[in-house]
Amino acid sequence: MTSVVVVGTQWGDEGKGKITDFLSANAEVIARYQGGDNAGHTIVIDGKKYKLHLIPSGIFFPEKISVIGNGMVVNPKSLVKELNYLHEEGVTTDNLRISDRAHVILPYHIELDRLQEEAKGDNKIGTTIKGIGPAYMDKAARVGIRIADLLDRDIFRERLERNLAEKNRLFEKLYDSTAIKIDDIFEEYYEYGQQIKQYVTDTSVILNNALDQGKRVLFEGAQGVMLDIDQGTYPFVTSSNPVAGGVTIGSGVGPSKIDKVVGVCKAYTSRVGDGPFPTELFDEVGDRIREVGHEYGTTTGRPRRVGWFDSVVMRHSRRVSGITNLSLNSIDVLSGLDTVKICVAYDLDGQRIDHYPASLEQLKRCKPIYEELPGWSEDITGVRKLEDLPENARNYVRRVSELVGVRISTFSVGPDRDQTNILESVWSSL
């Protein structure tokens, strides 16, 4: 039994897709366990970029199984579009498996997402308006429609009618909006279900059988720990659990079958949307990092907020997600800076704290306490060994590891697969 979970340790966009793609080379099954098409991940193969939102990164390996787990919420329209995109690019999808227990995002979820966000006014949480939150709301309220329901024409229509009756009351009476007619969406979405039917199965059986047979299984998280609904910067979070513990619920695999947790982070920090960000930069350095790092959302295209590396955030992520190994990405983005900073603690009302507060009011008053390190001017995008990094860059990498308290297994100096360098093989140490 060999299994590895890949989680983002910041607010998403840490390069999980790249690391998952890298680790997938030695895995036999790759599975996603939470989130939906609000999470974009970019894979670069031979200089060509592929952008995915639902399908696991392992789809580019035709000999491996890629799984959309039961903890995900699936927009069938987006999924069919993504499948068609892959087919047009010459990528086979015969190895895809979709959980029959995953919940379905429908047009009324997206409309409700939009209306709820608009109603918040200045208190918006920065949702991607993909219907993720409302779909998880229906799941928790036990009125959600699952993939298994979508495939049965009569059951799908019955449950769609029931849900539309409730949602339309909200649209018309609470939001003064237009009702959605069942005939406008039923046939379209039933047809999407028929197009994905060949991939649908009980994925928990596939995953557990693979682990019992000693196969290598890689679990791919979306978003990041700081967007986790329980452990993140609530309420500026997603509606699911990106932490490693989400694997057990979102894939149907017991916790005793998880061996290692790889935490993925950038050498700086970024965030899309609203919410606390203690190390955020508003100066020319921040603008430079954003441009050099191409910090624009894969899903939304929005400019990301950027800031210095925050070891307080990272230690929180390490603790709540049980991180055993670290993948440090985008070190090259910091090249050319005279000084680089790492947040080592916060100053809260004159008191030094080393943990991440739950209170948003306290977070607003937190001031980062920085440790400054000398920067480096060299182009490091061609570096393939740690010892070949400039001394100051090596010192930065080592200091990150010391402050987080986790050994670094890989470091990256660019977006391409061959720019990811191994310090310790995650698979061979199992």
Curated annotation (Swiss-Prot):
Its EC number is 6.3.4.4. It is found in: Cytoplasm. Its cofactor is Mg(2+). Pathway: Purine metabolism; AMP biosynthesis via de novo pathway; AMP from IMP: step 1/2. It catalyses: IMP + L-aspartate + GTP = N(6)-(1,2-dicarboxyethyl)-AMP + GDP + phosphate + 2 H(+). It comes from the Bacteria. SUPFAM superfamilies: P-loop containing nucleoside triphosphate hydrolases (SSF52540). It is an enzyme of class 6 (ligase). The keyword Magnesium applies. Mg(2+) binds at D13, G40. Binds 1 Mg(2+) ion per subunit. IMP binds at D13, E14, G15, K16, N38, A39, G40, H41, T128, R142, Q223, T238, R302. Substrate binds at T298, T299, T300, G301, R302, P303, R304. GO terms for cellular component: cytoplasm. The keyword GTP-binding applies. Belongs to the adenylosuccinate synthetase family. Homodimer. Plays an important role in the de novo pathway of purine nucleotide biosynthesis. Catalyzes the first committed step in the biosynthesis of AMP from IMP. This is Adenylosuccinate synthetase. It comes from Streptococcus gordonii (strain Challis / ATCC 35105 / BCRC 15272 / CH1 / DL1 / V288).
